């Protein structure tokens, strides 16, 4: 007889996924998020009762953290006991199928709850003094579509477009974000087609309370736009002009100033790294800008919690 037959598990090492879920259990504002979603949840008058709302919210978060499709999330719940424990499935409880998981996502999309999820999470972070709002860093990143995303007529998503970056063409969308200049936490998210110029979205990435904005050379001309006045724009010098400046007496001083600005701008890259590398969101998952932008808002909201989790855990233990 094996130890597993007796119900004994001699393994004590926790995986990175288990550690992450344990951390998220303690730092996520579960109560506030449920209060946000509950008024929109369907109520069954007859037939089988709907799945527990808290369970479905946790499954939705699992999908974002580990890059799971609806089908993959269903299968993961069957395969991994620690997933079931995290979402609250025990004993003989039913496991939500892919259709139920899909319907919950559609519920969030239908009632435009993803921006509000970002607001709820940021309110928690602001309460801990992690969002100062005195400065903003803006930037955008390309998120390509998978090469096989065509409909039955062989046509690509009409809401996505192609653009050239360097010597390479990309087909997909852009995620534009505004982050807190001090903490690097995201406060604003906008999704557009890939061919939209960054500078056209710069003003929309500001929350209105900042006094200074940092941006790369792609935002040249932003201070001259009518909708972007009233703040101090610190925009990177174009590479060609920066190279010429090195030949002038002020070159060394200007180079130091550019390096200081680059150090602040670097914080905007951290959320991009989290959603693309940590959460695995390197390609768009759905068709259409609305659905993909909604997912991006949830991803960046969860990336804020992920980036601030060490501070939140420390304060929770204090």
Locations of regions flagged by a protein language model:
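Phosphate-backbone recognition surface of nucleic-acid-processing proteins
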Residues: 83-102, 235, 241-250
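Charged, often Cys/His-bearing segments associated with DNA-binding zinc-finger transcription factors
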Residues: 1-31, 38-39, 314-317
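Structural motif
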Residues: 46-53, 167, 286-296
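Amphipathic, well-packed alpha-helical segments that form the structural scaffold of globular domains
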Residues: 34-42, 122, 272, 276
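Polybasic low-complexity intrinsically disordered regions
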Residues: 2-5, 28, 52-53, 57, ...
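A positively charged, amphipathic N-terminal helix/segment that binds anionic biomolecules
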Residues: 21-35, 40-46, 51-71
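Active-site-adjacent structural elements in folded domains
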Residues: 40-46, 88, 161-163
